[in-house]
Amino acid sequence: MNFFSDTYFPQLDNFKHNDIFQNIKEVWDPLKDLNKIILRILAEDNSGGPIESISGLRIDTNRLIKSIVVERWIKLKAPITSQALNIRIEGGTVLEPTAIIKGPAIIGENNEIRQGSYLRGNVLVGNNCVIGHCTEVKNSILMNHVEAGHFNYI
């Protein structure tokens, strides 16, 4: 890609959304436009089954910002998407009860979103990651194989 990305992100080629790191000056530059980046990615690929079709996922409309509440253990067999919520979750991901996901959010393949975790919007998660129980994540990019242990704030 370039010296900067090669130096700070040596495995960037394996990250599905590596284009967001092209032509950046500082490592945090993509975070400045993360909302727009996620919405662009979702607009380019809105494939996947509807989130509403998955038993055990409830769309919470009682809040000011709509979200998904996980009511039981779920392992997704295929991608799911909600254009209304601006959320996409890839197949192989495990969702545990009481997790809450607000959009915009993209969650890659084969992740574990553990009990009580709170993805609070503007979240881009790579593949094979773990969001530990009672961990809150917002305005963040988690590359592949990141493990955010329990009781964290990211």
What are these regions (language model features)?
Residues 1-79, 83-85:
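Terminal amphipathic alpha-helical/low-complexity segments used for targeting or macromolecular assembly
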Residues 59, 63-64, 69-154:
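Structural signal for interior beta-strand "rungs" in well-ordered beta-sheet cores
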